[in-house]
Amino acid sequence: MCTKKNKDYRNTDTCPVLTDVALKKSALEGKIRKDHKRAKIMYNYVHDKRAAYFKAFSEIYNSKCAYCGVLIGIIDIRMFEVDHFVCEDVFSNDTTGRSEAGKVNNLVLSCYSCNRGKGKLVIDGQYKKTLNPDDNAIAKVFMRDDNYYIKIQSVYAGDHIIADFYERLLLGSEFRRLDYLLLEINNLIQRLHDPITAQKLEQCFGKLVVKRNKTLI
């Protein structure tokens, strides 16, 4: 069950946890700058799914949306995007501003649903720390209840900014429960030693993924 207050709602019990995200992102930015001496806006290099940098960036997040936890494979990689955690509109509309907005430490792996829902929501002040997905602070704001819905922790129940974030990203939606089930099935398949059972689960997984994605088109 996923009801413990220290449990990361984005993970099942067998999911790898996010670790050293800031260090890994810094290392990736260093590699980009080494490969491209005149690079200014890191977003331009990281967001291209055809480039190796996107793969490296997504692996920092264990190939999962940093906000809801959906896995690449449950939804197509083409439905994943690189989000500006602090939206671009907060920064000046010039090269300096775009460079600041596009620094790797302000970029987050996000599914299409979360990124488009978040939109131009301004995250500032204390909320840059409270909702930070990189250091797992966000996992203290939301939780899974007994029915695997994502809920706001009681301590933040009256917080309008948190509620707005929750509603915009549709974190309480039914399909977030299905994504969690699919994550559980995927992890179980990886652990199974019986190929026949694994094959049956893979077939079930595939059918659920198709149904899930058709429903949301």
PLM features per residue range, with description:
Residues 63, 78, 83, 147-148:
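Beta-strand-connecting loop/turn residues
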Residues 127-182:
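Helix-loop elements that line ligand-binding/catalytic pockets
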Residues 1-14:
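Extended, low-complexity, charged intrinsically disordered regions
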Residues 158-217:
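C-terminal, charged low-complexity interaction regions
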Residues 65-68, 111-114:
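Short cysteine-rich clusters marking metal-coordination/redox-active sites
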Residues 2, 17-67, 91-101:
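Short, charged surface segments at domain edges that flank catalytic/cofactor-binding sites
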Residues 70-109, 118-125, 129-136:
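Histidine-centered nuclease catalytic patch
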Residues 61, 71-80, 115-117, 187-190, ...:
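Hydrophobic N-terminal alpha-helices or hydrophobic patches in metabolic proteins across all domains
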